[in-house]
């Protein structure tokens, strides 16, 4: 059974890389019929649903994981990302804060928290988070682009 689900996960991943998200969802559904509590399948299906802009369904997939693994960093970050997409920046930040309690140097959580802070209007605090992410990985493009954008915004206001 394990080799079948691993094979389906690989197929689904390749389909996602090719932009065939609907076909990938079929693979994830097949996996979840076999292994309903598969962490990887639940998270990856959530990401795929997010790519298709089915945000509330994606959130449900992340909740499935967080119900049994409340400290799953991937599920927490993706939940924050989905909430950010819905404009629920404060809620998103609360998920990033959990990640940062678990891993103070998680550059994705630092950067995403900065993005949510920026969208909430706290540009100076966003800059601090982008800068902290870059102090950990100076080549992290998303943090650098976000930092540059935030600084330009500060100069123009």
Regions found by a protein language model. Name each.
Residues 5-6, 39-40, 73-74, 107-108, ...:
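Helix-start (N-cap) detector for alpha-helical repeat units in TPR-like alpha-solenoids
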Residues 16, 43, 50, 77, ...:
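Position-specific recognition of the canonical hydrophobic site in helix A of tetratricopeptide repeat
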